[in-house]
Amino acid sequence: MGVFRTRFTETFGVEHPIMQGGMQWVGRAEMAAAVANAGGLATLSALTQPSPEALAAEIARCRELTDRPFGVNLTLLPTQKPVPYAEYRAAIIETGIRVVETAGNDPGEHIAEFRRHGVKVIHKCTAVRHALKAERLGVDAVSIDGFECAGHPGEDDIPGLVLLPAAANRLRVPIIASGGFADGRGLVAALALGRSEERRVGK
């Protein structure tokens, strides 16, 4: 049992209130298994894999490296070549993944389908209004990404120290503080903001 028991650790069955978010080209089985074995919530990045079949194979490979919980990130982006999101979603469900992190465009249809199959959903948000919508859609938690986050920080340029308490004041679901956290001091800062989770990004 970890030092901190939180709604996040209890909801997602992990030892520590730390999540490794989806990272394109990096979120592979080796990294996810290392995070899971250390007691955090790990995620494989679905679109790092060139096809839904390759994702299913990567999930199987990760299970060879850990017997602890891990999830899959499914980022919904506009692309010139359509992505077969329904097929990726089906691969996630059919392989028995129990946690999904969605990000990007409107995740409504995906959230509904995941929840219909008993999959817990975390949605990554860069604004309080997006987080409130995700909560209305039925997510189990939201990741609040401040401007410090890597990847897709949104368009508002609001840092986490401002965005996180604003979100905490309005949301009922667990919040993962994301962006710029890389050590124990960051975790304590997340706790001081009134929430008990953080996404660890960085070295």
Where are each of the predicted segments found?
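Active-site entrance/lid segments in N-terminal catalytic domains of soluble metabolic enzymes
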Residues: 1-174
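Glycine-rich beta-to-alpha active-site loop
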Residues: 124, 174-192, 197
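Conserved small/polar residues in nucleotide/adenosyl-binding loops
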Residues: 198-203
